[in-house]
Amino acid sequence: MAKVREVYQSFTDSTTKTLIQDEAYRNIRPIMEKHKLSNPYAQTIEAANDLEGFGIATNPYSIELHTHAAAKTIENKLLEVLGSLLPQEPVTFMFLKPRKLNFMRRNPRIKDIFHNVAIEPRDVARYPKETIIHKLAEIETDTAYISDTLHFLDPSYIVETFQNCPKLQTLYATLVLPSEAAFKMESTHPNIYSLKYFGDGFQYIPGNHGGGAYHHEFTDLQWLKVGKIKWRDPKDGLLGHLNYTHEQVDTHTVTVQLQESFAANHLYCIRRGNMMTPEVRTFGQPDRYVLPPQIFLPKVHNCKKPILKKTMMQLFLYVRTVKVAKNCDIFAKVRQLIKSSDRDKFSAVELVYLVSYMEFLAALQATTCFSDTLSGGLLTKTLAPVRAWIQEKKMQLCGLEDYVKLVKAVDWRPVDFSFKVETWDFRFTQLGMWKAFQPSELSDVEEMNNFFDDGDLLDCFTRMPAYAVNAEEDLAGMRGNNQEETSTAPREPEGEKKEYINPAETFLDKLTRKHNRETRSRAAKKAKRLAEIQDSMNRDRTEEGSHKTPNMGEAPSNADLPGVNEVEAGTTFPTLKALPQKWEDASSTDSSTIDPTEIIPGEEDDKAATQKVVVGLPWKHWLPQLNAVGFKALEIQRDRNGTMIMPITEMVFGLDKEEFPEGTPEALARELKAMNRSPTTIPLDLLRARDYGSDVKNKRIGAITKTQAASWGEYLTGKIESLPERKVAACVIHGAGGSGKSHAIQKALREIGKGSDITVVLPTNELRLDWSKKVPNTEPYMFKTYEKALIGGTGSIVIFDDYSKLPPGYIEALVSFSTKIKLIILTGDSRQSVYHETSDDASIRHLGPATEVFAKYCRYYLNATHRNKKDLANMLGVYSERTGTTEISMSSEFLEGVPTLVPSDEKRRLYMGTGRNDTFTYAGCQGLTKPKVQIVLDHNTQVCSANVMYSALSRATDRIHFINTSANSSAFWEKLDSTPYLKTFLSVVREHALKEYEPAEAEPIKEPEPQTHMCVENEESVLEEYKEELLEKFDREIHSDAHGHSNCVQTEDTTIQLFSHQEAKDETLLWATIDARLKTSNQESNFREFLSKRDIGDVLFLNYQKAMGLPKEPIPFSQEVWEACAHEVQSKYLSKSKCNLINGTVRQSPDFDENKIMVFLKSQWVTKVEKLGLPKIKPGQTIAAFYQQTVMLFGTMARYMRWFRQAFQPKEVFINCETTPEDMSAWALSNWNFTRPSLANDYTAFDQSQDGAMLQFEVLKAKHHCIPEEIIQAYIDIKTNAQIFLGTLSIMRLTGEGPTFDANTECNIAFTHTKFDIPAGTAQVYAGDDSALDCVPEVKQSFHRLEDKLLLKSKPVITQQKKGSWPEFCGWLITPKGVMKDPIKLHVSLKLAEAKGELRKCQDSYEIDLSYAYDHKDSLHDLFDEKQCQAHTLTCRTLIKSGRGTVSLPRLKNFL
């Protein structure tokens, strides 16, 4: 599977991954449905893992609760297995509820028989009344089943059942017996059940639910070993067999075999006849346990509890490797190895025995005391066996040598859940003598003191069976008994042979006594299931409130809109109608146009003036149609080129005006005639229909249609292809957005009401809901999305609204497929965007849009709008009568609460991932009407068609805000002026320093942690594994032909050789580092990359802005804060030593090129644990030296933005900058959630991966802080034109820039929030490229589209936040006790300092770092795992032995 998994993980294409996931889901569904019967419950993660080990799947989304869900699931699974074994004929079920037949998938028509006896009071409620009997009747079927009862029965029950039921051949039985109880162990499946032991037995508690518990005696465990049961014919008495031989006895046998076993639940098959059965019966054992030998006297002082073999081996190797294993050291080691959650499973006495045993092993010599067979001559080798025999006899007389003691002491006995199958022979033993074979009952005190004197529980268990005895030995023993004892032996009960004697009498008595002895109560009934979420799709949606806009009142509801009066015949000019004060809903769609209200005409002179104007209008003959849709149309308007705008365009003449088909509602026909939209017959293009049908059949397009059966697709294409031709009456209505194309139709539908044979087909679900809202008095199924209409059928009249957004060929295919369609009505806009098919394989991708096909059947185009104001509409070439001025603005900032229009669907998904759910594409916004919209301009805008741009620009009624996130290219080419020397560019500013950090008041001193002790460890235990794989020096060094080998592996000390020493003078390493870390380019390519990544940079900034709580509007520039930040930067620089300032003279000179960078190799010791002893030396790191004024300028910029960032950042975000470990620890204790897994993030080549996208992000961030434009342009210049001796560098981050730390940190935050969907309130800590979160967030869906465009690649590390697994951040572990240095990394660094002989120089620093962990003392056992404890102990001992320490050494001396 590892190879297969590796292949699957190598797939990076999102489409391929989607296909794999779809295929996997199709396979998962039937499997989950199969397991739903036996496991419908909500399980814990641990229980689900255990169940999967038994082959039982768990639905992670199940919410059905149960008090012991895992145990009940196993019970159900066994019933399912049993159901597959039972014959399809009547079966007798005993002690079973009839409803459990469902789990067996049993046919209810089979007339099964139920025999249930009410043994306990709760059985009356458990079993249906009709299935309860007073005595178990004779079984008259071939097969029977006993449910979860056999473990309480005597063997006599099986004997008498088969003896008195001659028809019975097979008896299945389930029983619940944990095999580990034979060793008095804790439950091996604690997530399923637990065990409690008492003097006479134990209690099995499913799911820790006391109400489902029941008591077992240890003798019940005999059922785990039974293989055969034999008995004699009952016609003769017991004594009558004494004179018979073994062969003369009439023998009856049943064979018992284990059919299936899950945890403590087992299914037995008991078959009449003497058959073969395995000699050994094995039960599941998840872990390997051992028992130490009994070597101490009295035996009570030996280890009796089985212990994990792994733990025993760890303890044994520990005591044999340390120099002196003290008693306290061994106790400390035991504490490390035993999990905190498992400590309650051990008694203190057992731990004392275990430690004493290990101390005994530590004191013995492990060198053999015997001679070898290789030394000596012939005589010596000949006498060697004799000498060995004498030595062995001598040890028997005088005592064993240490070596022999050690070998015998470590001869651990494995605890195996495999038992030898036994035969229970009753031919010569009374059936009533079951109790004689039980162990003698002891009191609790006696059992504690004496039970193990004769051996452990395993021995007792193996002695308990008395039914596996040899028959001849039993017979001889019985003959030896005196006659008096034999004559008084109890006889079998007598009675009529044909009458069935109830064999459950003993069983009833036994359970009655058990019930009286136990004091437990039944738990509450199973918790109620969660109420199902009701489907709200059929509810009436609450009508949203409309927006109020200037010069535009509140929109009226559609129900209150007045109708349109027909123009009176015989008038010389039309009746004039005034525009309504309230026209349209600001949130309505294109089809939401409102009828005007009629007003009484004015005075006669007004009529005359109006008549004069009308006569001069080019469209005077179209005024009735224009008035019908709410336009006066008395004004001549012109576009920006001075061309007159005609409200009626694209007129088509010569179209026949046909009558409406029969059955067309009168109201609908009347409205269409009023608009001059009479139908005309259209011949459909069947080739377009066939292309669409082919794509649907082959599942190349669509969403819902892909789920249809293949036969449906065949039927669709077959019906279309069978038509020679198809004609249909059609009314084609074209008009601008907001012209009122659909309003008249909606008015007619409201008038028609319910009962019509009309279907409205919409391209989107949003538009369907809009129509349902505006025409509420019709059937909901009248309005359908286009795929639903194709699958579910339509009426005889079909209205296609916004049909340009329907797939090409769809209209033809639907009309051809549904032959009942008589009339189609098409509404759309030929000037707006059309449907775009993204599938390359689709045939319809090559078809022209539907508007081109049907435009020739549209009588005219209504080029007027009620939506846009006149100025904007005229610029778009559209007629409008809305007065006022449309507000146009442009900036790089986003407006809040305003819909955002972007050019690409990819950008839309990314923006929605930042929380901007009201984001639409230019094309996808068609149908939207809003008072304000903001349009994002990027490099994709220029490739958008005119139709798409018209859709975007015509959405707003009042304001359009353009967002330009790019830099001003003209300003970019302006260079910074030459700067003076250091003494002149250090400006004198007023001493208005930023407010310094004021530490919080000291908290009350907490009570110190209790002292502790950790076991002594081997000095090399941490680094030993790394040294074992260490290669030779020149095998690890980097080699180049020009400069030879590098010199990173130094000295002969293997400890020092683990660490790579990188030196600036190493030429080979320098050039290897340059090749690996630096990439060259040119200024033009860099700037081109910067511009091409604008789409990504603004997404990064929006996520950063949301994460850090920055205000939505730009932050006004503060000169006072800037000067204070500049003063801090200058003061920091001047605080350097005089030598450092003199060394920087070259970079302070005005002759030093502003864009010039000096590159050096950083000298350092590589101490990262993951890089210890690498087979090949890795390249080093570079340091860049910039022009000093450049560093100080951009350092000021970074500090300025940091000042505002700290003012706004949420409390759950911590940036480790100019803070102390105490600050971080206090923050973590207040904000970090330790109850769930956490995520730490690392990156691959973080500095080199910060390309143009990150630069774009930094520019937007600077603009949001209103940094002066000339500084932003200078920063872009230095990033795109940074020059080294090899040429111009590519855009990247360089160590030595002014804002390196702040920029790295902020890029880290932006990337993290762009990639992950981080829940609100999540604690986050950042510093440069390091970060950690207190949860494991999901990756945003939108990030998959962005991932390949970013060079930055993260390496998330998930920790479980439990002992030994805490999130790491900058070398610190974040724990429930606060932050502390990673003990392994601290120890590794300390060992390097010790090996170099420099420990005394830096001991104070190491003691301070160590103190953050050491102060917690005893709590460290709950925080560190074994390896971390080893490193911590060795660090403490090393510092103590060094003999010098002034910080925390006095406290450390108390450690050991």
Swiss-Prot record:
Region (Disordered) residue spans: 474-499, 513-563, 581-600
Location of the (+)RNA virus helicase C-terminal domain: 863-997
Stretches with biased composition (Basic and acidic residues): 529-547
Record-annotated (+)RNA virus helicase ATP-binding domain positions: 695-862
Reaction(s) catalysed (UniProt annotation): RNA(n) + a ribonucleoside 5'-triphosphate = RNA(n+1) + diphosphate; ATP + H2O = ADP + phosphate + H(+)
Record field: compositional bias (Polar residues): 480-489, 586-595
Binding residue positions for ATP: 735-742
GO biological process: DNA-templated transcription; mRNA modification; RNA processing; viral RNA genome replication
InterPro entries: (+)RNA_virus_helicase_core_dom, Alphavirus-like_MT_dom, DNA/RNA_pol_sf, P-loop_NTPase, RNA-dep_RNA_pol_alsuvir, RNA-dir_pol_PSvirus
Pfam families: RdRP_2, Viral_helicase1, Vmethyltransf
Keywords: ATP-binding, Helicase, Hydrolase, Multifunctional enzyme, Nucleotide-binding, Nucleotidyltransferase, RNA-directed RNA polymerase, Transferase, Viral RNA replication
Ranges where the Alphavirus-like MT domain occurs: 59-224
EC nos: 2.7.7.48, 3.6.4.13
Domain called RdRp catalytic: residue spans: 1236-1343
A molecular function GO annotation: ATP binding
Positions with biased composition (Basic residues): 513-528
Family: Belongs to the potexvirus/carlavirus RNA replication protein family.
Role this protein plays: RNA replication. The central part of this protein possibly functions as an ATP-binding helicase.
Protein name: RNA replication protein
Taxonomy of the source species: Viruses, Riboviria, Orthornavirae, Kitrinoviricota, Alsuviricetes
